Structure formats: structure tokens, C-alpha cells
Amino acid sequence: MNYEFEREIGFINSQPSLAECLTSFPPVADTFQSSSIKTSTLSHSTLIPPPFEQTIPSLNPGSHPRHGAGVGGRPKSSPAGSRGSPVPAGALQPPEYPWMKEKKAAKKTALPPAAASTGPACLGHKESLEIADGSGGGSRRLRTAYTNTQLLELEKEFHFNKYLCRPRRVEIAALLDLTERQVKVWFQNRRMKHKRQTQCKENQNSEGKFKNLEDSDKVEEDEEEKSLFEQALSVSGALLEREGYTFQQNALSQQQAPNGHNGDSQTFPVSPLTSNEKNLKHFQHQSPTVPNCLSTMGQNCGAGLNNDSPEAIEVPSLQDFNVFSTDSCLQLSDALSPSLPGSLDSPVDISADSFDFFTDTLTTIDLQHLNY
């Protein structure tokens, strides 16, 4: 700082000191010589910045007016200053080399923001950019931005015609300020979009129909299961009723005598149980000989009616035969045989008096079952 301050003060003084001249001139000459050598060897290939002394006017001795006035006896200072002061014009503008040239990819990346900022109105400029990019080869085209009016007209035309003929395509391109290629590409893309939309709708409809079919199948299966269950219940109920009815008929048939004379079956109408039938049922559980007794009584009764005997026709009042009860019949049957057979083919011999007695007594019991 003191050195520079003294030099600035020396600008006012007309006579500089000897030490100041000795310290300032030799390095300046060396720098000028080195700069001239470098410029000659490189042959203006690169731009070399000026020396540090030239950037600061206070440190440049050639531009200082006091050097010309004070140090006039030294001729070396002026030629050195004259050699270093002029700068050639070629050094300021270096030549371009292949590695210094900008690539087209960098230009393409820089162009889309500018194109987007201009808006969709500059269609002619965009077309020129697309042509320039297409000539480069291997690079991707810029996407065309259509205006609302262009899209509206294109959609209208697509609604009526999915495919365009050449004259119509040229007409639409001229009407909408587009190229024929742009119109063709837009229609291709629109057809693909329409195809995707229709396929999605068909898939959704098929899925909905399939779901409806599955639901209807499930409902039908449930209804079939319910109907089968109801049928099984009704069949089981009918079987139970039938079994109960057959059981009741079997019980009643066991109480009656179904066998007739000479193997002919004789059926009796079903009537409600009377007091005598109840007594017979009671004795049926007590002794196994009651059905045999009843069968013999039915056979004797049938024989008496078929022979038209006066004993069978002349029926006395039932009050006269109250003496003969079922107990007496059972006692008589037990007295005659411990195991009385139920058929006429029995090998046991019974006397005629006993048959007459049975016919007289049993006809009165069987007459109670007849409906007059």
C-alpha cells in the first residue's frame, strides 16, 4: 500500500526517485517479453488474458504520463510499451473447433420450453421446428399442440367419418392450418382411443352379465334345494300318516275275524270301538288264546248263517244273554284245550254237543258287530 501511495504521490511530483525506477521497470519488461513469446508460439490458438499490470492502470508504466516526462533518456521504455500495448483482433475472437460446437441435442432440450411459452398460436414456427428436427435423424419429434377449435373440428369429422379419404384430409388440413400428416396421425390416434374405449365397455358389460348369471344360478339352486326339502318333508309326512293308518287298520283287523267258512274271507265294516271290543282288546293282552277263540266264533257264526238254521234266524234279545260274558268263553276255551287251534284242520276232536253250545253262545256275540 505504501508503494502504490508513493507512486500516486509521485504522479504529482515531476521528478521520481531512482529506486522507484529500478524496482518498477525490469519486471514489466519480462512480462511483456513472455507474453510476446507465448502469443507467437501458440499462433493465436487461444485467447490469452492481458497481464496483470494492464488491468490496473496505476501499475501500467506505459500509460503513465510521468514516465515520458521524467525518464526521457531511456529509449528502451518506449519500444517496450509500444510492443506490448497493441492487441491483435484475432486474439479476441478465437476460432471454433469440433469440440467447441454445441450439439443438436442441447438445442432440442432448450427449444421446447421456448416453444411452449409461445403458445399454440405459432403453428408455422412449430412446423418448421419439426421439419428441422426430422432432418437431424434419430431424434424424436415434438408433440403437436392442437387448439380447441382444431380439436373440435377434428372430433366432429371423426364422429361422422372414422376414416378420411385423401381429398377430405387435404381440405381439413388447409381449413385448420395443419399439415396433411398431422391430420392423418391425429385420426390414427383417435381410432386407437375409440377402440380401447369400446373394448373396455364390452369387458364391463360381459363381467356384469356373468355376475348376473351367477346370481341367477345361485337363486335357482337355492329354490331347488328348498323345493327338494319341502318335497322330502311332504313325502315323509305322507309316509308317517300312511304308516299310522296301516298300523290302525292292522290293530282293528287283529280285533276282527277275517276268515270265513271253507277258506272264504269275510270282511266286516270298520266301526268305532264298543265296550265289548274294548274288553276283547284288554283280554288280548292278557291271554294269547283270545284270537283263537274269536276265530272259532267267527267260523261257527258263518256256518250257522249259511245253513239257515232256525237258531241263527230267531235272535233273542241281548239282555237274555248277559249271563254269557267273555270271561265264561275264555274259561270254557281253556277247559276244552290249553292251545285251541285257529283253523278247522286241527287234529283235536271236539264233540257235537260242544259245537252246539258254541253256536248258541257265539252267534249272540257276533250279532253285536252286524249293522242292520
UniProtKB/Swiss-Prot annotation:
Region listing for Disordered, in residue ranges: 48-95, 194-225
Chain ranges for the short sequence motif Antp-type hexapeptide as given in the UniProt record: 96-101
MF GO annotations: DNA-binding transcription repressor activity, RNA polymerase II-specific; RNA polymerase II cis-regulatory region sequence-specific DNA binding; sequence-specific DNA binding
GO CC aspect terms: nucleoplasm; nucleus
DNA-binding interval(s): 139-198
Gene3D superfamilies registered for this protein in UniProt: Homeodomain-like
Annotated GO biological process: anterior/posterior pattern specification; brain segmentation; cell fate commitment; cell fate determination; cellular response to retinoic acid; dorsal/ventral pattern formation; embryonic skeletal system development; embryonic skeletal system morphogenesis
Keywords from the named record: Developmental protein, DNA-binding, Homeobox, Nucleus, Transcription, Transcription regulation
Family: Belongs to the Antp homeobox family. Proboscipedia subfamily.
Role noted for this protein: Sequence-specific transcription factor which is part of a developmental regulatory system that provides cells with specific positional identities on the anterior-posterior axis.
The protein's name in its UniProt record: Homeobox protein Hox-A2
Organism, as annotated: Mus musculus (Mouse)
